[in-house]
Amino acid sequence: MQRCKPFLCALASLVLPLCLCFAPALAKAPLTVTVLDVGQGDSIFVGFPNGQDMLVDAGDQAAGPTVVQYLRSRGVTRIDILVASHPHADHIGGVSRILGVFPVGRVWDSGYVHGSRVQEDFLRTIKAKGIRYGKPKAGFSQQVGEATVQVLAPPAKPLSGTDSDANNSSIVLRITYGAVSFLLPGDMESGERATVAKWPRSTVLKVAHHGSRNGTDLAFAKAVSPEYAVISYATGNPYGHPHRETITALQSAGAKVLGTATDGTVVFTTDGKSISYTTSHTAAATPNAARQATGESTGPAASAATDETYYIGNKHSKVFHRPSCHTLPSAKNQVIFRTRDEAVVQGYRPCKNCNP
């Protein structure tokens, strides 16, 4: 075997360290967080740098196919963590479709017992498939590669007697990757918000409860101080979301406000240092969610979103509901109506709870 000549060996020992010092650093794999446009509901997809995937909620039942299509477009074949922030139909109604298409590693659930058919079907399916099931509370933390997922709420002792105990039992997540963080509070209202002594600053805030005034106040907005705030809602929804007070609070805290009804699906990408985003609709100079909340016209996107309105009928009781109603029938007992008149003509009467 030939040995290295002394001169060449000495030269190599000098040059190699210099090459290593000046070699460009390998780019870190990105973390992506997608707030999907699912109408008046929530669904957030998280693609971790290590290749694992998390889905937080899946919108209402009609949104299920939309979520499935998006996940397939991203090449998802398995969901490692499926989070049901709380049991309302506009957050977990689409989960049944997800469970029927993708294998799921584990489910995180708020643990709040709502008693609706939607929740019963959800829990029954998890049990039948033998999926690992947990109810993480404040203080729980999970490392996913180089990213960290923290649970900030709900507290170990459930809240009761609030305006909405279900909303105030939402799993509140904070996902951190390097210097960039995302706060996902479900439908948290003021009761649950008060259980967190100090809210951490976060780069991106998925606004609580579709922009309702009970989900965000000025003190909370300033504490979190997000660069971006995304509101998931449908144009023309019966609740008036997002409320003007919420938009004002977010803007006062310096956030750029985006909305799924007008900006479409919003995708954030970060390497842990910088962050960028894209939307499925052309962004306007003034954030569209803010324009709608102040009564300004939002153009064609606003009228297009109203086409997503539909109603769900109960085949047995002949009662029809809004998709977000808490008393929806089981999936096998549902019939979909595109308009209210269609339901009435077919002999269905409106639900007294949701007043469709």
Role assignments for model-derived ranges:
Residues 50, 316-317, 342:
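Residue-level recognition of short loop/turn positions
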Residues 10-21:
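Bacterial N-terminal signal peptides
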Residues 2-3, 7, 22-305, 327, ...:
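Non-globular, low-confidence helical/coil segments that flank catalytic cores
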Residues 326, 330-356:
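Compact, charge-rich alpha-helical regulatory domains located at protein termini
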Residues 311-330:
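Short aromatic-glycine-(Arg/Gly/Cys) micro-motifs in beta-strand/loop hairpins
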